[in-house]
Amino acid sequence: MVRIAVVVSEFNYDVTQLMLQKALEHAKFLGAEVTYVVKVPGVYDIPTLLRDLVAKEEVDAVVTLGAVIQGATKHDEVVAHQAARKILDISVESGKPITLGIIGPGANRMQALERVEEYAKRAVEAAVKLARRKKTLREAKYAGSTVFID
């Protein structure tokens, strides 16, 4: 069974709480166990706790959830881009999948609410698939013919 952790932003709570609910439902549907749900103040804060989560033996992958709503400035772009960059860095460094379920930048509140289910489900599905494929790849042995991992 794949064990995932979820890190969810509290900012734009009306959106992110729905995302968390959909993510938990989808993880159960896929047969994954959610070992941790960690709340952080905002999307920009997500990378702060990722290293601690990926270091845990009972975490095979991490799902990040958040919503960066467009404002009058380009602040949403800075927040979303920097968080995404750091999330990917930590995933590559740790060797554990960390998926991006972050709505934005450039989304208004209505668009964010419309994307809740899609972003949450896709992030969970990607985490589960990557964790399973990573395990399969570790156990795979080349024996003269192409090894397909899907």
Swiss-Prot record:
* Gene3D superfamilies documented for this protein: Lumazine/riboflavin synthase
Q: What is its EC number?
A: 2.5.1.78
User: Which SUPFAM superfamilies is this protein grouped with?
Assistant: Lumazine synthase
Q: Which residues form the signal peptide?
A: none
- InterPro entries for this protein: LS (IPR034964), LS/RS (IPR002180), LS/RS_sf (IPR036467)
What catalytic activity is recorded?
Answer: (2S)-2-hydroxy-3-oxobutyl phosphate + 5-amino-6-(D-ribitylamino)uracil = 6,7-dimethyl-8-(1-D-ribityl)lumazine + phosphate + 2 H2O + H(+)
Q: Which UniProt keywords apply?
A: Riboflavin biosynthesis, Transferase
Q: Which domain of life is it from?
A: Archaea
Residues that, per the record, bind 5-amino-6-(D-ribitylamino)uracil? 11, 43-45, 67-69, 100
Q: Kindly identify the residues recorded as the active site.
A: 75 (proton donor)
Q: PANTHER family attached here? A: 6,7-DIMETHYL-8-RIBITYLLUMAZINE SYNTHASE (PTHR21058:SF0), 6,7-DIMETHYL-8-RIBITYLLUMAZINE SYNTHASE DMRL SYNTHASE LUMAZINE SYNTHASE (PTHR21058)
Role noted for this protein: Catalyzes the formation of 6,7-dimethyl-8-ribityllumazine by condensation of 5-amino-6-(D-ribitylamino)uracil with 3,4-dihydroxy-2-butanone 4-phosphate. This is the penultimate step in the biosynthesis of riboflavin.
Q: What is this protein called?
A: 6,7-dimethyl-8-ribityllumazine synthase
Please report the organism this UniProt entry assigns to the protein. Pyrobaculum arsenaticum (strain DSM 13514 / JCM 11321 / PZ6)
Q: Lineage, please?
A: Archaea, Thermoproteota, Thermoprotei, Thermoproteales, Thermoproteaceae
The encoding gene: ribH
